[in-house]
Every structure is written in C-alpha cells, then in structure tokens.
Amino acid sequence: MSTKKVYSFLSQAFIFSAIMLISNIIATHLPIPMPSSVIGLVILFSLLCLKVIKLEQVESLGTALTGIIGFLFVPSGISVINSFGVMGQYFVQILTVIVVATVILLAVTGLFAQFILGKDEKETEDTKELKVVNKGRKHGKVA
C-alpha cells in the first residue's frame, strides 16, 4: 500500500511561479528572443527528469491548467484577429513560411523515426546473434 502525499494548491502555484520567474530572468538575458514559457517548460521538464521536483508536487495544478488550456489561448486568438490587416498584406509570405516549416518538420520527424527504428532493428539483430553465440558456448561449440 503506497501513500501519495497531496500538495496544496498554494505550494504547487509557488513552484510554477518560481519556475516562471526564473525563466523570465533567463529570457531577458538571452541574446536571442525566446519565449519565457518555453524556457519554463524546459526547466520544469529538466527538474522532473532529474527528480528535483516530484510529479505529485505539480500534477494536480498541471492537470487543472491543461483542463482550461483553450481559455488560455483566447488572448492569442484575439491578437491574431487584431493583426488581420498585417496578415492580409503578407499573406503569401506567411503561408509560404507555414508550408515550408510544416514540410521540414514532417521530413525531420520521419527521418528521426527511421533512424530510431533502424537502430532498434539493428540492436534486435545483434541481440539474436549474441544469443546464438552464447547458446553455442553453453554446448561447447565455440565458433
């Protein structure tokens, strides 16, 4: 029987707030423009992977925020609507960038998947060969 510690909303909000504060500081000091939210996600992911923060310390607030994610995108949608004049002026360029970026993303994802699957296949073949060699050694037949 395992007991799971329940963390208060306030402690979870403090963890998220501290990470966002750190990511805002990092974003202002970077030489390239990068959204602080992306930096915050990377920091949170790293802290979870390194087990500095346990999942249960941020899980319920993360789940709640995921539940209202559509509402959180409303300001972005409004700013896109407000920018229709600029978007109409540069429609072809914007569409070209979107299409090219999508094709590049699909190609890189496909190549990476093939690389990983090919590596996995090779490891499977190597494992089979190793088992055959080890079987031969058990029976006194060394090649």
From Swiss-Prot:
Pfam families: LrgA (PF03788). Its main location: membrane. The keyword Membrane applies. It is a multi-pass membrane protein. One of its GO terms (biological process) is killing of cells of another organism. The chain crosses the membrane at residues 6-26, 30-50, 61-81, 97-117. Disulfide bonds: none annotated. It is found in: Cell membrane. It comes from the Bacteria. Keywords: Cell membrane, Cytolysis, Membrane, Transmembrane, Transmembrane helix. GO terms for cellular component: plasma membrane. InterPro entries: Antiholin-like_LrgA, LrgA/CidA. The keyword S-adenosyl-L-methionine does not apply. Inhibits the expression or activity of extracellular murein hydrolases by interacting, possibly with LrgB, with the holin-like protein CidA. The LrgAB and CidA proteins may affect the proton motive force of the membrane. May be involved in programmed cell death (PCD), possibly triggering PCD in response to antibiotics and environmental stresses. Belongs to the CidA/LrgA family. LrgA subfamily. This is Antiholin-like protein LrgA. It comes from Bacillus cereus (strain AH820).
